[in-house]
Amino acid sequence: MRNRRFISFLLVMLLGGAACSRSAKTKKLDIVLVTKALDSEFWQRLKSGAEQAARQNPEVRLAVLAPEREINIDQQVAILEDQILKRVAALAVAPAGVAEIIPVLEKARAAGIPVLIVDTDIPWPHRAGFVGIDNRLGGRMAAEFIVRAIGGRGKVAVIRGVLGVATQEDRLAGFLDVIQKVPGIHFVGAQPANSERALGMTVMENLLTRHPDLRAVFATNDQMALGAMEAIAARNLTGKIVLVGFDAGREAVRAVLDGRMDAVVAQFPERIGERAIQEAIKAARGQPVEKFVDIGTGLVTRENAHEFLR
């Protein structure tokens, strides 16, 4: 009898241990990527890269969330607050603002949730790390191309994204680093179009009306560049105004290939998304995270555009 009881006890312990082992194996690591929006090819490609990283780690359950538009900072704050309440394992965030976002990131820190910053760096010392590009360098690349294309003379404008967003400020600053050193170039200003195509078209139309002798335009993302391209085409000025974009989505690259745009600064959103989740997983596990990961940039011109369409 005593032996039977002992055997029963062992079976219970073994079965219980197996159940615990299965539970430990099936426990998911909840990682949440919060972007500025998902309404453009850039963010969709970044999302795709993040999902690829999650597929390579079966224990990870990834959610990708975003406000409707990049200017909807309040929506991003609400999304982050909701995920903090859910006690997720780690957050990867592309901040839509600075002053508005840092307080909610502090809430995540207080809850013990590591936060990796993606795409748009911010002056927050408690981030686990950053994954993105050197946007100032990208702005310089655009300016150097324009200076060569117009022979260092003429009026130049910038169509820029949301005011105060670090990526946009850095791209503009890099552009001005170069342009302001060229005596023959007259910089007529930077006009915001909130990274939106329709607004980019409107801003370009206004620039053409105000400056009919405009020689070149740098749009700090693809969507605004494509809108500007449409405004230029509507006035039969394609090929007469140098147009440079930023991001290198497929539509923009095709526009460079067929001569409707002149160049586009390339970043690699799939790589950014994939590396961001890889680093977020490390942070969730308490492992060391790289503090600054620069994915790198390139310049798409008519000569190499086909390489970016593979």
Q: Locations of the language-model features?
A:
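Flexible loop/hinge segments that line or gate small-molecule binding clefts
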Residues: 98-137, 145-148, 155, 247-262, ...
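Short, solvent-exposed amphipathic alpha-helices that sit
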Residues: 42-56, 60, 138-142, 166-185, ...
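Hydrophobic alpha-helical
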Residues: 90-109, 175, 188-189, 193-254
